[in-house]
């Protein structure tokens, strides 16, 4: 797999679990002999939801909820077959969405 690049994009609601998953991926890739660029923090998506607290009236009484999606990007340059096999067997924490592009 010479002159190839694997781009891994991670998404999670909690930044601590996201950083642990990114550290596991980087450690696995470097242990198998591939070059790693990252983890690069991407902009955090912020969704804001405003709802009325009361069921029927009192529109002035509202509550706001926020949901943040943290993202990281990892590039693995010149991966070997050993790197790909190790990444496929890697156990990541639940709650982390992984997108892989070759």
Curated annotation (Swiss-Prot):
This is Small ribosomal subunit protein uS10. PANTHER family: 30S RIBOSOMAL PROTEIN S10 FAMILY MEMBER (PTHR11700). GO terms for cellular component: ribonucleoprotein complex; ribosome. One of its GO terms (molecular function) is tRNA binding. The lineage of its organism: Bacteria, Bacillati, Bacillota, Bacilli, Lactobacillales. Pfam families: Ribosomal_S10. Keywords: Ribonucleoprotein, Ribosomal protein. One of its GO terms (biological process) is translation. The gene is rpsJ. Gene3D superfamilies: Ribosomal protein S10 domain (3.30.70.600). Involved in the binding of tRNA to the ribosomes. Part of the 30S ribosomal subunit. SUPFAM superfamilies: Ribosomal protein S10. Belongs to the universal ribosomal protein uS10 family.
């Amino acid at each position: 797999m010479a002159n190839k690049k694997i781009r891994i994009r991670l998404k999670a609601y909690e930044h601590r679990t996201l950083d642990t998953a990114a550290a596991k991926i980087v450690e696995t890739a470097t242990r198998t002999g591939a070059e790693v660029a990252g983890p690069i923090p991407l902009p955090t998506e912020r969704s804001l939801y405003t709802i009325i607290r009361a069921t029927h009236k009192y529109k002035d009484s509202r509550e706001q909820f926020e949901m943040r999606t943290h993202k990281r990007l990892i590039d693995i340059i010149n991966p070997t077959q050993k790197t790909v096999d190790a990444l496929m067997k890697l156990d990541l924490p639940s709650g982390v969405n992984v997108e892989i592009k070759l």
